[in-house]
Regions:
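Short beta-strand-to-loop capping motifs
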Residues: 93-97, 130-133
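A structural signal for short, well-ordered beta-strand segments
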Residues: 41, 91, 124-128
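Catalytic/regulatory signature loops of cyclic-dinucleotide turnover enzymes
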Residues: 117-123, 140-160
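Conserved acidic
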Residues: 1, 45-48
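Short amphipathic alpha-helices in soluble, non-transmembrane regions
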Residues: 105-112
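Conserved long alpha-helical elements within nucleotide-processing catalytic cores of c-di-GMP signaling
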Residues: 6-40, 47-73, 84-88, 92, ...
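Conserved catalytic/ATP-binding subdomain
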Residues: 21, 136-139
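A short pre-motif secondary-structure segment
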Residues: 80-86, 120
């Protein structure tokens, strides 16, 4: 379990990351109290994840999700990023808008997938929404990050 001093009901059972409601509340509190500059919401999705489960089995899919979740818990614990797992393969991070760190996150998740299979049909898609208006609804920020992630689906080059 993560080192979150939180109620178990606020954590997604498989991953141990914040559920949607708690993630949205934590980000809202953070924005209201800290007024950070240069931060973003990141949406992470695994392209064709349902097909991954069909081909390799749900145990392999769960293992992949657990690997990603452990990495994101580490980001929470070491870097104080806010991390969440909304459903299936939908993960979110509130973090500084740092292209180098985003590429590193992509590389780590790509490595986890590559360990399990050798087909480029299952690639991480990462969408970034730069927080420029703190008053915007956090759910809308997450939706915008998901839209950005969906815009790279099917592309081979830049997937962030």
């Amino acid at each position: 379990m993560p080192n979150y001093p939180d109620s178990i009901q606020d954590l997604e059972p498989l991953s141990g990351l914040y559920i949607r409601k708690r993630f949205l509340n934590e980000v809202r509190t953070f924005l209201d109290q800290k007024h950070p500059q240069g931060w973003c919401i990141v949406a992470i999705d695994i392209e064709n994840f349902k097909l991954f489960n069909d081909w390799y089995g749900q145990d392999s899919g769960d293992y992949l999700l657990l690997e990603i979740a452990a990495y994101l818990r580490n980001l929470h614990q070491e870097d104080n990023y806010i991390t969440g797992h909304f459903s299936a393969d939908d993960f979110f991070i509130c973090m500084p808008d740092d292209g180098h760190k985003l590429r590193h996150i992509y590389a780590i998740i790509y490595h986890y997938i590559d360990k399990l299979e050798q087909d480029d049909s299952f690639l991480p898609s990462i969408g970034v929404y730069r927080i420029e208006d703190e008053s915007l609804n956090v759910s809308t920020m997450c939706n915008n990050a998901q839209i950005a992630a969906s815009s790279v689906v099917g592309k081979i080059g830049n997937r962030i």
